[in-house]
Amino acid sequence: MIGENLRFALGDFWAEFRKNRAGMVGLALVILFLAAVILEPRIIPFPKAGATWHDITAWDDNPPSAPPQWINRFTEKKAAITSVVTQYEKTSEQSDSSTLVTYTFSYQDPYDVPPLDLIVHFVAAGDVPFAVSVVRPDREEVPLYQEQRQAGTREDVRVSMDRNSASALFDYLKGYESEDTLSSVDPGQLKPVQILFSVAEPGMLKHPRPLKGMYQVKLQGLLLSDASALDNPYVVFTGRVSGLLGTDNSKRDLWSGLVAGVKWALLIGVLTSFIAVAVGVVYGIVEAYFGGLVNAILQRIWEVMVNMPLLPILIVLSAVFKPSIWFLIVIMSAFFWVGPVKTVYSMALQIKEETYIEATRALGAGHGRIIFRHMVPILVPYSFASMALSVPAAVVYEATVSLLGLGDASIVTWGQILHDAFSGGAVLNGLWWWVVPPGLMIAVMGMTFSFVGFAMDTILHPKLRTR
């Protein structure tokens, strides 16, 4: 019987809820946020972004402060997009005492602005002399780097051509530029990758023209013994634009950071509002049920708490103690519970005068049974609406604390991204893709639960429908 009544009640609620356009928009956004949490590893290019966000070395292959790649649609000159090439052709040449392995990667360059860097990754073991060269579209092969690698065990090797091939490209320029031009150039200040992707002609140093077409990157390694190895190679072409939302000045992918922050925003908002509303509902019922001295004492406590400024207290406590997401949730819950108390109190005053409450008391039911079995269930629908309306405040408070640099540094939140943006000079340098998206996400998250909360409030309180 109870299950059937619940089913009909939920059916009636849904029939009313789906008529509310704002509520349906909010519900759709909630589903979208939940889908982002569930599908996070599949929809971001860096699935471990949450764990490595504060590990700057994990983002070395990205360009710093790069705009989103879709910006190319609105510019005359198309900038190179960051690309990872994992497909290769492998050849081996065996001799009596060694083996020469060659990995060839193909990269089509249709861009007007060349990549920032060309980075070669592989795993090496033992004594492995290796060399990197590039065959340009004009069929000229340019040697870039070589090294005698000695590794006792297998280790990851990363070679950046922007950092390691300046001397090789300076030698390459000698075939095209005059001695007077070269004498005025410091080899250490060259931009090797820009030269590599330019038409080979006199004047290419000062006025480079893009050389478009197919480039082939060759990685050659000489395996001197059975213990030597060179495998798992791939090449990264670090572009001038990167990802759906660009990168920050630490080369971190902002799309990955925003998606990784969704789960923390939901956790902060939902858990804080759940704890606060649960405490507030019980507090208001107890205050109304007992009345008298209990009511007077609880009323004084409520008046003290409701007049205490939460944000300054949060800032001071976060500065004194080690910032933690759980610490913030507890502190916010300790202040948010005052929100629903007065409404619950007024409703509970009416409920406790109902005939069935008097009958339950006459049958010998205890105070706890009356409160939790007969009064709390009646106020549960209101509790859900109050919870939804409390979520935006929790999200904004956390973002404010993080914006001041006092958030939990072990996770990724939108407030932290905004803090990094302001401390990194994003506004002054016009890096709008670093500031606007996290701000919009905070606003949309707040709007989402406000829509749902107001829709539920309107349905569960019929007098509000005329508002």
Where do the PLM segments sit?
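Gly/Trp-centered helix-boundary motif
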Residues: 1-269, 421-439, 443-444, 451, ...
